[in-house]
Amino acid sequence: MDTIIKPFDKLTTQELFNIYKLRVDVFVVEQQCPYHEVDDIDTISHHIYLQNDNSKILAYCRLYKIEDTFHIGRVIASPKRKGYGTQIMKTAIEFAETTLHVDTIIIEAQTYAQEFYEKLGFIQTSEPFDEDGIEHVRMKYVRKKNNKNNTNHPENKKIIIKAKKYRNLNKINCCLY
C-alpha cells in the first residue's frame, strides 16, 4: 500500500480520474446526493490518498486553506471498517502539522461520523445543519502543544537540548514529566 500526497497540479490524469470516480460513487451515487462533486477547491487542495498495489484508492481526503483556515474535506474510506479512514485522517493531520505547520483544522462532518472524528481529536463547534440534504456538524482539531510524540515541537527540542547539556540525567527528571 502507498500513501500519496499531491497538490492538484501534480496529479496525473489517471489519478484525478480515480479520485473523482471514487468521490462520485460515494457522495453522489451511494449517498443519493445529486450535486456538483467537482469544485474549485480541488485546485487549491493537497489530495491525500491510500492506494493498494493495483492502484485502487482505499481512502481519500483533501486538505486546503481558505483565507487563514485549513480544512479537511471529502473524506472517504472504501471499503469501510478496515482502518483506512483513520489512517488517511492521521496522515492528513500529520502532514498539516509537520509540513504546513498548521495548528487548527476545520471539518464539516456528517453527523453519523462525528464519533469517528472525535476519536481523532476533533471537537464539535456547531449545532447540526443541513448541507445538500445531509446533516452535518462543524468540528475543529487543535494541535496539542505538549504532544510528547511530536519531536519537532519546540518544548520537546528544549528537553533534548537540556538532556545533552547534563551528564547526570537526574538533574533534568523534572523536565521530562
Q: For the regions a protein language model found, what residue spans apply to each?
A:
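Short amphipathic alpha-helix that is part of the acyltransferase structural core
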Residues: 1-42, 47, 52-57, 166
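Conserved GNAT acetyl-CoA-binding A-motif
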Residues: 96-110
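Conserved beta-strand in the GNAT
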Residues: 49, 56-64, 69-76
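C-terminal "cap" of GNAT-fold acetyltransferases
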Residues: 110, 130-177
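Conserved acetyl-CoA-binding loop-helix of GNAT-fold acetyltransferases
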Residues: 77, 82-94
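Short acidic/glycine-enriched loop/turn segments that link adjacent beta-strands
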Residues: 42-44, 68, 131-135
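Conserved catalytic-core motifs of GNAT/GCN5-like acyltransferases
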Residues: 106, 118, 123-138
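Conserved beta-strand segments that form the floor/walls of ligand-binding pockets within enzyme
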Residues: 71, 76, 106-108, 138-140
